[in-house]
Amino acid sequence: MGRSMVLISAVVLAFLVAAPIPEVTAKKYLVGDKKFWNPNINYTLWAQGKHFYVGDWLYFVFYRDQHNILEVNKADYEKCISNRPIRNYTRGAGRDIVPLYETRRYYLLDGRGGCVQGMKLDVLVETPPPPPPFTPPPPAQ
């Protein structure tokens, strides 16, 4: 009986080791890269070619006494209206994050005058792609 338990344990362990584990990694995006969250930056161009997925997050670096990060609706985004935000992501440090928890479009802007100078970002968050199919290793010879 002891030998069969060892054999069963070995088979279960081998299965667990060989089973594919989906890679779940959130990505942190530094908004604007080394230019950060500042006026006169084309954030539409910055976002081009990037795929934002549920679980990712946007990291904003800015002068805390000059700028902020507000989420607004599409109409307010297009007109740079900031007096009725959906959410204020500013925490006061000038190093703030926007977690992307939902598959939807996020309209973000600076509500302290920077929006009219280009400080606005439209991000479409997608469902993460499925993990690649598991290919079992070739049998040992």
Swiss-Prot record:
- Which N-terminal stretch is annotated as signal sequence? 1-26
> What cellular component GO annotations does this protein have?
apoplast
Keywords (alphabetical) are: Disulfide bond, Glycoprotein, Signal
Matching Gene3D superfamilies, A to Z?
Cupredoxins - blue copper proteins
- The superkingdom of the source organism is Eukaryota
* Glycosylation site positions: N42, N88
Is Disulfide bond given among the entry's keywords? yes
Instruction: Return one GO MF term.
Output: electron transfer activity
Q: Which InterPro entries does the entry mention?
A: Cupredoxin (IPR008972), Phytocyanin-like (IPR039391), Phytocyanin_dom (IPR003245)
> In this UniProt entry, which cysteines form S-S bonds?
C80-C115
Q: Which residues form the Phytocyanin domain?
A: 27-127
Q: Which family does it belong to?
A: Belongs to the early nodulin-like (ENODL) family.
The record's function comment reads:
May act as a carbohydrate transporter.
**Protein name (database record):** Early nodulin-like protein 19
Source organism per entry reads: Arabidopsis thaliana (Mouse-ear cress)
